[in-house]
Amino acid sequence: MTKPDLASLEKTIEKAFDQRDGINTATRGEVREAVEQSLILLDRGEVRVAEKQADGNWHVNQWLKKAVLLSFRLNPMEVIKGGPGQSSWWDKVPSKFDGWTANEFEKAGFRAVPNCIVRHSAYIAPNAILMPSFVNLGAYVDKGAMIDTWATVGSCAQIGKNVHLSGGVGIGGVLEPMQAGPTIIEDNCFIGARSEVVEGCIVREGSVLGMGVFIGKSTKIVDRATGEVFYGEVPPYSVVVAGTMPGKNVPGENWGPSLYCAVIVKRADEKTRSKTSINELLRD
């Protein structure tokens, strides 16, 4: 689509969102068409909820998040076929693969292992691999990414090129509050098994998270080499493991419970990453 078309879509979505209390399953016309077109563009990867700028910052297209939210008001619950044992689901969001044949899969160019679930409006780039996993609406999974077994990519999350989300990883979705940005895993990151990155946090390019690392907006991310503490963002090429920090003493005592933190144990640039296995990087 041309820029004027996108500008028109954005204007319609913004106006509709301001008047969302009057929008329901009976709504027809311009609003419904704009929402449906926005979701199709997201599904094709022609637009995305967040885009990285030349300065490294991420610009969030809030109007696309609003389009996703409006779709819940517009669409009724309905039977969705394809459940185990010829059963069905009951939901408002169809599968990305609804009506697909071999032709669509070949054109898309990614691998979808049985029992992976991808909702309509999520984009999956060529050469990505989806093990039995869940990718929520509005998400963007870039080229060569591996979404391993039982991993979850939340709504509007951005997964970069060649990212590996190990088994059971959770990447949080962010639709509301509206001003919040999506959770972002930049290119060439490795996220260890059962780790969680949520609340719109960003893991910068080339970083490695060990198994069981949990990062939210309030999590202290401590650089062991410098003592610097980060919140909400893992710096580029960081190697991060789970750790603890001393807590405040309990009243009347000289001890207190330790508190969870994430620890940057080293920095591994692109050259080091290419020559070193993940297990070696995570050894202290």
Curated annotation (Swiss-Prot):
Its EC number is 2.3.1.117. One of its GO terms (molecular function) is 2,3,4,5-tetrahydropyridine-2,6-dicarboxylate N-succinyltransferase activity. Pathway: Amino-acid biosynthesis; L-lysine biosynthesis via DAP pathway; LL-2,6-diaminopimelate from (S)-tetrahydrodipicolinate (succinylase route): step 1/3. The keyword Cytoplasm applies. The gene is dapD. It comes from the Bacteria. Substrate binds at R111, D148. Homotrimer. It is found in: Cytoplasm. It holds the Pfam family Hexapep_2. InterPro entries: DapD_Trfase_Hexpep_rpt_fam, Hexapep, Hexapep_transf_CS, THP_succinylTrfase_dom1, THP_succinylTrfase_N_sf, Trans_hexapeptide_repeat, Trimer_LpxA-like_sf. It catalyses: (S)-2,3,4,5-tetrahydrodipicolinate + succinyl-CoA + H2O = (S)-2-succinylamino-6-oxoheptanedioate + CoA. PROSITE patterns: HEXAPEP_TRANSFERASES (PS00101). Keywords: Acyltransferase, Amino-acid biosynthesis, Cytoplasm, Diaminopimelate biosynthesis, Lysine biosynthesis, Repeat, Transferase. PANTHER family: 2,3,4,5-TETRAHYDROPYRIDINE-2,6-DICARBOXYLATE N-ACETYLTRANSFERASE, ACETYLTRANSFERASE. Belongs to the transferase hexapeptide repeat family. Its main location: cytoplasm. GO terms for biological process: diaminopimelate biosynthetic process; lysine biosynthetic process via diaminopimelate. Gene3D superfamilies: Hexapeptide repeat proteins, Tetrahydrodipicolinate-N-succinyltransferase, N-terminal domain. SUPFAM superfamilies: Trimeric LpxA-like enzymes. This is 2,3,4,5-tetrahydropyridine-2,6-dicarboxylate N-succinyltransferase. The keyword Chaperone does not apply. One of its GO terms (cellular component) is cytoplasm.
